[in-house]
Amino acid sequence: MGDLAAIILAAGKGTRMKSDLVKVMHPLAGAPMVAWPVEAARQAGTSRMVLVVGHQADTIREHFAGTEQVAFALQEEQLGTGHAVASAAAALDGFTGRVLILCGDVPLIRPETLRGMIDAHGATGAALTVLTTRLENPFGYGRIIRGFDGRVIRIVEEKDATPEERGRREVNAGIYCAEAAFLFDAVTRIGNDNAQGEYYLTDIVTMANEQGLRCTAHPVADPVEVMGVNDRAQLAEAGRFARQRINRELMLDGVTIVDPAATYIDRGAVVGRDTTVHPGVHLSGETRIGEGCTIEQGAVIKGSTLGNGCVVEPGAVIRSCRLGSHVMVKAGSVMEDAIIHDHTAIGPMAHLRPGTELMAHVKIGNFVETKKITMGEGSKASHLTYLGDASIGNNVNVGCGTITCNYDGVRKHRTVIEDDVFVGSDVQFVAPVTVGRNSLIAAGTTVTRDVPPDSLAIARAPQVNKDGWKLKQRDQ
């Protein structure tokens, strides 16, 4: 394929988005819009890329900071696409290969389409190849004008076209492949004598023909690939097509998606074979789902890793977590920055806050909240409990209503519960405190001192029964 560079036009503000955020940075299925053509160009085999930036240039630079092969060119005034490409010339000084030109607001172009255009460009010996498509309603697009031999002789913008030219349905997709020597010479000679007063890149088609160079068209069958995004309605439409593409690829790889139209999976997510994804699920960020999992209705998983055989019930929310294999997350549970080992069950309606680590075969039941704790293998807290700033050993039973009192109004303190401890219901641990292994904490106890191993701790007022008291109260 030879040496290949790409110029991606991303300098426009995007007024029709009616947003404080520059258009090309609006998210599309998990990535800024401009990241899609950047990735397509990378997969097409480019060795160098130049992003032409203008409005909110620093925002775009920051997103791509550290990205290999990406350089930036500043277009301080947006004077048209020809001016934008000319702005990138210095960044490709000395480059003698072929140059792809893409638009940052045309996100759905496929790498395969770009490779096909590059191959056709080389096979025909063209100086310039224009990607085209046919539209039922071509309004707003530049029309392709061909010569008798089928070559492209010029492109006419909508506002400059005659009625006959406006009737043509083959349109310019705004994506090109050009020989670098021709391109960078041509863009220095573009004028702005047109209805918009701009420097149109399309004028280089006429220049190629005037120089006796070949200019060809490479048609793309699916117009969706070259749809532009100018407002939020079009952004939503592009998002729908992007999700269709993502979901179809996953299904062809062995994932069951019950209702693809109602399933929202970002392009960065990976889902293993034989996993079933139900309607209303959102998988976003760098999420990794193992094989044989079940993700039920309305679950939200962001930036998390799930091992094989996990089950996530309806309405669960998992953010920045790492789950082992065969973990059960029951309905309505919320987890953030937690590490969960194999064969552990969470919920329903549990809340695991940052810093939670649960070892294998742990059970966290309904209305249990944890924060900055480790819980050893086989331990369980089945219901109505708060565990914060605690280290809990193996095979510990935490009774209903247990609370670690970890905050004294100034500092947080830790509770340590060693292996094989049984904690009865309605127990408070006033930290800092340590409970030795194999101890029993009686129900209703407030623990304020360390408990030795193999001990019974009981701290509650003795029960007093007053016979006949209720009858005496009634007679008064």
Swiss-Prot record:
It comes from the Bacteria. The keyword Metal-binding applies. Acetyl-CoA binds at residues 406-407, 425, 443, 460. GO terms for cellular component: cytoplasm; membrane. This is Bifunctional protein GlmU. Binds 1 Mg(2+) ion per subunit. It is found in: Cytoplasm. Catalyzes the last two sequential reactions in the de novo biosynthetic pathway for UDP-N-acetylglucosamine (UDP-GlcNAc). The C-terminal domain catalyzes the transfer of acetyl group from acetyl coenzyme A to glucosamine-1-phosphate (GlcN-1-P) to produce N-acetylglucosamine-1-phosphate (GlcNAc-1-P), which is converted into UDP-GlcNAc by the transfer of uridine 5-monophosphate (from uridine 5-triphosphate), a reaction catalyzed by the N-terminal domain. Pathway: Nucleotide-sugar biosynthesis; UDP-N-acetyl-alpha-D-glucosamine biosynthesis; N-acetyl-alpha-D-glucosamine 1-phosphate from alpha-D-glucosamine 6-phosphate (route II): step 2/2; Nucleotide-sugar biosynthesis; UDP-N-acetyl-alpha-D-glucosamine biosynthesis; UDP-N-acetyl-alpha-D-glucosamine from N-acetyl-alpha-D-glucosamine 1-phosphate: step 1/1; Bacterial outer membrane biogenesis; LPS lipid A biosynthesis. GO terms for molecular function: glucosamine-1-phosphate N-acetyltransferase activity; magnesium ion binding; UDP-N-acetylglucosamine diphosphorylase activity. NCBIfam families: PRK14355.1. Residues 1-232 are annotated as: Pyrophosphorylase. It catalyses: alpha-D-glucosamine 1-phosphate + acetyl-CoA = N-acetyl-alpha-D-glucosamine 1-phosphate + CoA + H(+); N-acetyl-alpha-D-glucosamine 1-phosphate + UTP + H(+) = UDP-N-acetyl-alpha-D-glucosamine + diphosphate. In the N-terminal section; belongs to the N-acetylglucosamine-1-phosphate uridyltransferase family. In the C-terminal section; belongs to the transferase hexapeptide repeat family. Residues 233-253 are annotated as: Linker. Its EC number is 2.7.7.23, 2.3.1.157. Keywords: Acyltransferase, Cell shape, Cell wall biogenesis/degradation, Cytoplasm, Magnesium, Metal-binding, Multifunctional enzyme, Nucleotidyltransferase, Peptidoglycan synthesis, Repeat, Transferase. Pfam families: Hexapep, NTP_transf_3. Gene3D superfamilies: Hexapeptide repeat proteins (2.160.10.10), Spore Coat Polysaccharide Biosynthesis Protein SpsA, Chain A (3.90.550.10). SUPFAM superfamilies: Nucleotide-diphospho-sugar transferases (SSF53448), Trimeric LpxA-like enzymes (SSF51161). Residues 254-476 are annotated as: N-acetyltransferase. UDP-N-acetyl-alpha-D-glucosamine binds at residues 9-12, 23, 75, 80-81, 142, 157, 172, 230, 353, 371, 386, 397. The active site is at 383 (proton acceptor). Mg(2+) binds at residues 105, 230. Homotrimer. One of its GO terms (biological process) is cell morphogenesis.
